[in-house]
Protein backbone atom coordinates (compact mmCIF):
# COMPACT_ATOMS: atom_id res chain seq x y z
CA UNK A 1 0.00 0.00 0.00
CA UNK A 2 1.31 3.44 -0.92
CA UNK A 3 1.09 6.51 1.31
CA UNK A 4 1.78 10.05 0.10
CA UNK A 5 3.91 11.93 2.63
CA UNK A 6 3.93 15.72 2.46
CA UNK A 7 6.70 17.60 4.26
CA UNK A 8 6.97 21.33 3.56
CA UNK A 9 6.62 21.53 -0.23
CA UNK A 10 8.04 18.07 -0.95
CA UNK A 11 5.99 14.91 -1.45
CA UNK A 12 7.39 11.38 -1.19
CA UNK A 13 5.85 7.92 -1.51
CA UNK A 14 6.18 5.30 1.22
CA UNK A 15 5.18 1.66 0.69
CA UNK A 16 3.76 -0.02 3.79
CA UNK A 17 2.63 -3.56 4.60
CA UNK A 18 4.45 -4.89 1.53
CA UNK A 19 5.17 -8.58 2.19
CA UNK A 20 7.51 -8.77 -0.80
CA UNK A 21 9.94 -6.51 1.10
CA UNK A 22 10.46 -9.23 3.72
CA UNK A 23 12.39 -7.95 6.73
CA UNK A 24 12.50 -4.48 5.18
CA UNK A 25 8.72 -4.22 5.11
CA UNK A 26 7.30 -1.19 6.94
CA UNK A 27 4.64 -2.70 9.18
CA UNK A 28 4.75 -0.75 12.44
CA UNK A 29 4.23 2.88 13.42
CA UNK A 30 7.84 3.11 14.58
CA UNK A 31 9.17 1.88 11.23
CA UNK A 32 6.94 4.35 9.40
CA UNK A 33 8.20 7.23 11.55
CA UNK A 34 11.83 6.22 10.94
CA UNK A 35 11.33 6.05 7.17
CA UNK A 36 9.57 9.41 7.02
CA UNK A 37 12.28 10.98 9.20
CA UNK A 38 15.03 9.60 6.95
CA UNK A 39 13.28 10.63 3.73
CA UNK A 40 12.55 14.18 4.84
CA UNK A 41 15.50 15.18 7.01
CA UNK A 42 13.47 15.57 10.21
CA UNK A 43 13.74 14.27 13.76
CA UNK A 44 11.57 11.20 14.36
CA UNK A 45 11.24 12.08 18.05
CA UNK A 46 9.85 15.60 17.62
CA UNK A 47 7.91 15.43 14.36
CA UNK A 48 4.14 14.87 14.28
CA UNK A 49 2.24 12.98 11.60
CA UNK A 50 -1.21 14.20 10.60
CA UNK A 51 -3.57 11.72 8.93
CA UNK A 52 -7.16 12.65 8.05
CA UNK A 53 -7.13 15.52 10.52
CA UNK A 54 -5.78 13.49 13.45
CA UNK A 55 -2.25 12.95 14.73
CA UNK A 56 -0.93 9.40 14.53
CA UNK A 57 -0.17 8.33 18.08
CA UNK A 58 0.93 5.11 19.72
CA UNK A 59 3.92 2.99 20.64
CA UNK A 60 6.54 2.11 18.06
CA UNK A 61 5.31 -1.49 17.81
CA UNK A 62 1.74 -0.55 16.86
CA UNK A 63 0.86 -2.46 13.68
CA UNK A 64 -0.04 -0.29 10.70
CA UNK A 65 -2.71 -2.84 9.81
CA UNK A 66 -4.70 -1.58 12.80
CA UNK A 67 -4.73 1.97 11.40
CA UNK A 68 -7.40 2.76 8.84
CA UNK A 69 -5.02 3.50 5.96
CA UNK A 70 -6.22 3.43 2.38
CA UNK A 71 -4.24 3.45 -0.88
CA UNK A 72 -2.66 6.87 -1.55
CA UNK A 73 -3.71 8.29 1.80
CA UNK A 74 -1.89 11.53 2.61
CA UNK A 75 0.26 12.08 5.70
CA UNK A 76 1.35 15.61 6.58
CA UNK A 77 4.61 16.02 8.53
CA UNK A 78 4.57 18.77 11.14
CA UNK A 79 7.45 19.95 13.31
CA UNK A 80 10.70 18.07 13.59
CA UNK A 81 14.04 19.83 13.54
CA UNK A 82 16.56 19.24 10.76
CA UNK A 83 18.42 16.53 12.61
CA UNK A 84 20.70 15.67 9.69
CA UNK A 85 21.06 19.00 7.93
CA UNK A 86 24.78 19.25 8.63
CA UNK A 87 25.70 15.75 7.46
CA UNK A 88 27.49 16.03 4.13
CA UNK A 89 26.37 12.63 2.84
CA UNK A 90 22.70 13.16 3.62
CA UNK A 91 22.81 16.69 2.24
CA UNK A 92 24.33 15.32 -0.98
CA UNK A 93 21.42 12.91 -1.39
CA UNK A 94 18.82 15.58 -0.66
CA UNK A 95 20.35 17.95 -3.21
CA UNK A 96 20.54 15.21 -5.84
CA UNK A 97 16.89 14.35 -5.29
CA UNK A 98 15.84 17.99 -5.54
CA UNK A 99 17.80 18.87 -8.67
CA UNK A 100 17.61 15.60 -10.61
CA UNK A 101 15.00 13.08 -9.56
CA UNK A 102 12.03 15.44 -9.45
CA UNK A 103 12.75 16.22 -13.12
CA UNK A 104 12.84 12.50 -13.88
CA UNK A 105 9.29 12.10 -12.58
CA UNK A 106 8.16 15.09 -14.66
CA UNK A 107 9.73 13.60 -17.80
CA UNK A 108 7.88 10.33 -17.28
CA UNK A 109 4.59 12.15 -16.72
CA UNK A 110 5.03 14.08 -19.99
CA UNK A 111 5.81 10.88 -21.92
CA UNK A 112 2.79 9.17 -20.38
CA UNK A 113 0.52 12.01 -21.47
CA UNK A 114 1.99 12.07 -24.99
CA UNK A 115 1.40 8.33 -25.45
CA UNK A 116 -2.19 8.70 -24.22
CA UNK A 117 -2.72 11.57 -26.68
CA UNK A 118 -1.33 9.45 -29.53
CA UNK A 119 -3.66 6.57 -28.66
CA UNK A 120 -6.68 8.85 -29.04
CA UNK A 121 -6.02 8.78 -32.78
CA UNK A 122 -6.86 12.40 -33.55
CA UNK A 123 -4.00 12.73 -36.05
CA UNK A 124 -3.89 11.29 -39.55
CA UNK A 125 -2.14 7.93 -39.73
CA UNK A 126 1.17 9.18 -41.28
CA UNK A 127 1.45 11.83 -38.57
CA UNK A 128 0.63 9.26 -35.89
CA UNK A 129 3.43 7.03 -37.16
CA UNK A 130 5.86 9.95 -37.17
CA UNK A 131 4.85 11.00 -33.67
CA UNK A 132 5.06 7.40 -32.46
CA UNK A 133 8.66 7.05 -33.66
CA UNK A 134 9.67 10.24 -31.86
CA UNK A 135 7.93 9.10 -28.70
CA UNK A 136 9.63 5.72 -28.85
CA UNK A 137 13.03 7.44 -28.86
CA UNK A 138 12.02 9.62 -25.90
CA UNK A 139 10.71 6.68 -23.88
CA UNK A 140 13.86 4.63 -24.55
CA UNK A 141 16.07 7.61 -23.67
CA UNK A 142 14.24 7.86 -20.34
CA UNK A 143 15.51 4.39 -19.43
CA UNK A 144 19.08 5.40 -20.26
CA UNK A 145 18.77 8.55 -18.16
CA UNK A 146 17.30 6.66 -15.21
CA UNK A 147 20.08 4.06 -15.35
CA UNK A 148 22.67 6.85 -15.22
CA UNK A 149 21.00 8.21 -12.08
CA UNK A 150 21.18 4.75 -10.49
CA UNK A 151 24.89 4.54 -11.26
CA UNK A 152 25.48 8.02 -9.85
CA UNK A 153 23.64 7.25 -6.62
CA UNK A 154 25.46 3.95 -6.23
CA UNK A 155 28.81 5.70 -6.58
CA UNK A 156 28.12 8.51 -4.10
CA UNK A 157 30.39 8.59 -1.05
CA UNK A 158 27.70 9.25 1.54
CA UNK A 159 29.47 7.67 4.53
CA UNK A 160 32.93 8.39 5.93
CA UNK A 161 34.91 7.05 8.88
CA UNK A 162 33.59 9.99 10.91
CA UNK A 163 29.91 9.29 10.18
CA UNK A 164 28.04 8.07 13.30
CA UNK A 165 26.39 4.65 12.98
CA UNK A 166 22.88 6.07 13.32
CA UNK A 167 23.59 8.67 10.64
CA UNK A 168 25.16 6.07 8.36
CA UNK A 169 22.00 3.96 8.63
CA UNK A 170 19.83 6.94 7.73
CA UNK A 171 22.04 7.79 4.77
CA UNK A 172 21.79 4.22 3.46
CA UNK A 173 18.03 4.22 3.92
CA UNK A 174 17.73 7.53 2.08
CA UNK A 175 19.79 6.25 -0.85
CA UNK A 176 17.74 3.04 -0.93
CA UNK A 177 14.53 5.08 -1.03
CA UNK A 178 15.81 7.12 -3.98
CA UNK A 179 16.97 4.00 -5.82
CA UNK A 180 13.64 2.25 -5.23
CA UNK A 181 11.83 5.31 -6.59
CA UNK A 182 13.91 5.24 -9.78
CA UNK A 183 13.40 1.50 -10.20
CA UNK A 184 9.65 1.99 -9.86
CA UNK A 185 9.77 4.60 -12.62
CA UNK A 186 11.84 2.23 -14.78
CA UNK A 187 9.22 -0.51 -14.38
CA UNK A 188 6.45 1.93 -15.26
CA UNK A 189 8.42 3.18 -18.25
CA UNK A 190 8.99 -0.37 -19.51
CA UNK A 191 5.23 -0.91 -19.40
CA UNK A 192 4.72 2.38 -21.24
CA UNK A 193 7.19 1.33 -23.95
CA UNK A 194 5.36 -1.99 -24.46
CA UNK A 195 2.09 -0.10 -24.67
CA UNK A 196 3.54 2.27 -27.28
CA UNK A 197 5.09 -0.56 -29.30
CA UNK A 198 1.76 -2.39 -29.37
CA UNK A 199 -0.02 0.71 -30.63
CA UNK A 200 2.65 1.21 -33.30
CA UNK A 201 2.15 -2.40 -34.41
CA UNK A 202 -1.56 -1.67 -34.83
CA UNK A 203 -0.77 1.45 -36.88
CA UNK A 204 1.62 -0.53 -39.09
CA UNK A 205 -0.93 -3.29 -39.61
CA UNK A 206 1.09 -5.94 -37.77
CA UNK A 207 -1.71 -6.36 -35.22
CA UNK A 208 -5.40 -6.18 -36.00
CA UNK A 209 -7.50 -4.07 -33.66
Curated annotation (Swiss-Prot):
InterPro entries assigned: BAG-1, BAG_dom_sf, BAG_domain, Ubiquitin-like_dom, Ubiquitin-like_domsf
Span of domain Ubiquitin-like: 7-84
Entry function: May inhibit the chaperone activity of HSP70/HSC70 by promoting substrate release in an ATP-dependent manner.
Organism: Caenorhabditis briggsae
Keywords of the record: Chaperone
The protein's name: BAG family molecular chaperone regulator 1
The keyword Chaperone belongs to this UniProt entry's keyword annotation: yes
Lineage: Eukaryota, Metazoa, Ecdysozoa, Nematoda, Chromadorea
Assembly information from the UniProt record: Homodimer or homotetramer.
Keyword Metal-binding applies: no
SMART domains associated with the record: BAG
Stored Gene3D superfamilies: BAG domain, Phosphatidylinositol 3-kinase Catalytic Subunit, Chain A, domain 1
